[in-house]
């Protein structure tokens, strides 16, 4: 089986996947900056929810005892794990999307994998994808107290297609082309969902 990741990278990625949304406030960073000025100041207004999730995840990882030099890990290996966890979590900030895709380096592989997993519902069966779409719209309505992305009780499919074409397909294409052997179906499945959503635009 062909792979581009060593076991330590895989471990780091799994930790990042578990913790990347541990401080998801249910709103975007712009709304969070307005509601939590203290967090905005703490992180200089950059990647707020991702920054908090990163800090919490690393603190829990250190407290867990999983990274101990007496368990055979070297200082450089511990630093490597913490770096991969941190950069992978921070890469899920969509405002950094273009910047992250352009890196296209071996070190960026974990970030692309995590971003793909974060957006993976676009590559799921249609009925599963629709559940995620409606859940996301409900979350936005609850937390922003306005109808975001919804018109007369229906999903704004034009906005959904724009999001997918801007963020999702490019991420999956990068995954398929540069990171993971055999991941092309994710792109094809997502493309099919996007085309079906495009048919619903009114």
Enumerate the language-model features and the residues they cover:
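Divalent metal-dependent phosphate-bond-processing catalytic cores, especially two-metal-ion Mg2+/Mn2+ enzymes
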Residues: 1-7, 15-202
């Amino acid at each position: 089986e062909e792979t581009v990741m060593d076991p330590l990278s895989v471990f780091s990625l799994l930790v990042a996947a578990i913790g990347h949304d541990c401080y998801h406030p249910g709103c975007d960073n712009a709304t969070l900056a307005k509601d939590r000025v203290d967090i905005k100041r703490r992180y200089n207004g950059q990647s707020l929810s991702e920054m908090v999730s990163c800090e919490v995840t690393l603190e829990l990882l250190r407290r867990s005892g999983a990274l101990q030099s007496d368990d055979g890990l070297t200082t450089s290996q511990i630093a490597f794990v913490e770096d991969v966890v941190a950069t992978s979590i921070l890469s899920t900030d969509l405002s950094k999307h273009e910047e992250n895709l352009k890196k296209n380096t071996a070190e960026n592989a974990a970030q692309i994998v995590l971003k793909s997993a974060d957006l993976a519902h676009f590559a799921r069966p249609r009925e599963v994808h629709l559940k995620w779409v409606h859940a996301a719209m409900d979350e936005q309505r609850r937390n922003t107290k306005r109808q975001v992305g919804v018109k007369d009780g229906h999903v704004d499919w034009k906005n959904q297609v724009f999001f997918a074409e801007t963020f999702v397909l490019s991420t999956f294409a990068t995954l398929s082309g540069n990171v993971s052997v055999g991941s092309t179906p994710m792109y094809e499945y997502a493309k099919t969902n996007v085309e079906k959503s495009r048919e619903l635009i009114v």
